Amino acid sequence: MSIEYVQLQLASPSEIKRWSQRILPTGEVVGEISKADTINYRTFKPERGGLFCERIFGSTSNGECSCGKTKRRKLIVPVNFNRLTLQKRNAELEATQAIIEVCPSCGVEPTNSKVRRYRMGCISLKKPVAHMWYFRNSPNVLAALLNMRSQEIDETIHFQTYTPSKYGTQNYCLHGGVQWYVNHWEPMHPYFAGDIDVSMDKAASWNSKSTFMPSQIKTIENCGGEALQELLTRLDLVFLQRMLSRKLKNTIEKKKLAAKSLRKRHKRRKTAKLLGRTDQKNYGITIKVREYSRRLEFIRSLARKGLRPEWMILSIFPVLPPDLRPMIQMSSGRFATSDLNDLYRRLIYRKIRFEKFLTLFDEEFLPDLLIRHDLCLLQEAADSIIDNGRLDKPAQRPNRKPFKSLTSIIEGKHGRFRQNLLGKRVDYSGRSVIVVGPKLRLHQCGLPREMALELFQPFVIRALLEESGVKNIRAAKNLLQRRSQMVWDILDTVVLGHPVLLNRAPTLHRLGIQAFEPILLSGRAIQLHPLVCPAFNADFDGDQMAVHVPLGLEAQAEARLLMLATHNWLSPATGEPSILPSQDMILGFYYLTTLKPTVSLKRPVEQPMAVRGRNLIQSNSIFNNFESVLHAYETSKVDLHEIIWLRWSSYIQTTNSEPLQITVNKTGHVTTVYDSFVMQSGATNGPDNSMLSVQMKSRDTSSISKVYNCLTSLNAAAFYILTTPGRVLFNNLIYENLFL
């Protein structure tokens, strides 16, 4: 079954009854919760008529009643499907359905315990209560429908003002701090339930200050949520929709005319005073347009979905199924219960208390203060179930933490929709804090061994069954729990070459989840190369990342070929590189490749590198390979920034191709000094092997050219480049990371 969408909307009282009430095979109607009890403290079984009643919500045992005397029976009729026609087969299949009875002892219908997840109950209220979503939210739906202020709606619901039962009248005088005596109500009613221009100057025994100011307000029966229900019932949605559409159209036309007249006055250069008055009129028209459009929007929504506004006032309060608000016994013997059970109990207790007051007194002598107080408590109990966090004084646990209401269970990041329906926790995944791993390669990540053992547990179990002689899965799991060395060795083999996916929320683009090769490490933090952090928008100040294991071969191939971090250098949005060296890396490169500074108090005179190189030709800072340079640096024979000569057998690129000095010794070996390297060659084939030394002067290359042309017949030459141990070390690092 595919679910396209989930919609929350109003439910009628008959719909709530259909959810909760059902008829037993005996003809008895069950569904209404009459007691606030949950379970029996001796038998630990649900109380009858309580919040976990088995008669209302179904039995807790599969196919058994509460006492165990009655079980669910099935009538099995043998059917020969080959000879019967389709109609006879359907008729006999209907006869094979389960026969369900009701236990004569406990009255519980033996059913499957799964029905306790969807069977609902209800609480019938003597006086209706308002739904909190429709008078405490912004915009206020009840205020918009009744064309009243939000404060008036709130005061009416919580019995701070009076709404008369006579249609078309409104009270203009009652407010907090005034009490109306019962014997004075009849003579006062024409004044406070009639028109506003009725004279109040008549002398009467009740028209005095001492009568109006003694104590609190006096209300009549039709007040609170019942008063709003009466007003909402009288709303004609079709007429209101037609009337508001006409008013909205006329108001918009007035606004256009006002704007047109304003432009004319600007042309005539009227005074600023007249323009200010016009702006005030336009502002008032804008407010009216906003009010009309908002009210019209609510009315159209109700009419389009076939809903009635009086359904916002609840006279039958629905109760969730018991398995969605469970009560669980812990190992210590105590019970842990959902917060909703405590909130439902408060509502039932206050409902029972109010009904008891109605039975103790006659209607003529009801103590109004107590009745009004109980109705306020009943409204607050209903509000705390719907949205406890929005109350001024929310219902709290003994540890002074507020209860979680229905709204808090549904809304927010950890609510039912975002946490469990839209985004679910998946298998083969984990989460931990990320730390920097500078020794890792770009396509690698450090994975804790404990996390890897849990993530790759099925692969490890399969390897144990195939290679280690373990006979069954239970024995393999016992080996995993003991954490033997064989398990860690198999884990290393399983993880080798198996990519994992790292994801950091929020995943705003496709680079928010990339593939890496795991490297098993001790500890509990995930190590990540610092260069891949910009793609995740991550840093190492406590960020967490999720690990996912691709299971199938197709998923592993996709992770390795498409999602590997080294295959995602460029941003798909801008085309710019997402992997760039950080500032500390650039400073490290500079430190490795720079020359040794001259230590002097005076301003140093910078010598050309070639001059310093010529002075070093006769020194001992000459090396034949990289290993000898690194060994000399590790043994502190040379400094990191010291200038050395290194034998070089590869391609040389230089900006100046003319030699600076050519030296030929008596044996015929030629030493040619260039700007940044030295070339040594074998003996010449000429008759004279005398020493020849020519040094280039400024802008004079004739003598050099003569000698240089004589060197064309040299044997194989050896090149020595001018460098530093730091540059050799930097070259080795690049070579290891690029070509290995």
UniProtKB/Swiss-Prot annotation:
Keywords attached to this entry: Chloroplast, DNA-directed RNA polymerase, Magnesium, Metal-binding, Nucleotidyltransferase, Plastid, Transcription, Transferase, Zinc
**Does the keyword field hold Plastid?**
yes
Endoplasmic reticulum recorded as keyword:
no
Q: Catalysed reaction(s)?
A: RNA(n) + a ribonucleoside 5'-triphosphate = RNA(n+1) + diphosphate
Q: Which cofactor does it need?
A: Mg(2+); Zn(2+)
Q: Which domain of life is it from?
A: Eukaryota
Q: What does this protein do?
A: DNA-dependent RNA polymerase catalyzes the transcription of DNA into RNA using the four ribonucleoside triphosphates as substrates.
Q: Which family does it belong to?
A: Belongs to the RNA polymerase beta' chain family. RpoC1 subfamily.
Name the chain's protein: DNA-directed RNA polymerase subunit beta'
Originating gene = rpoC1
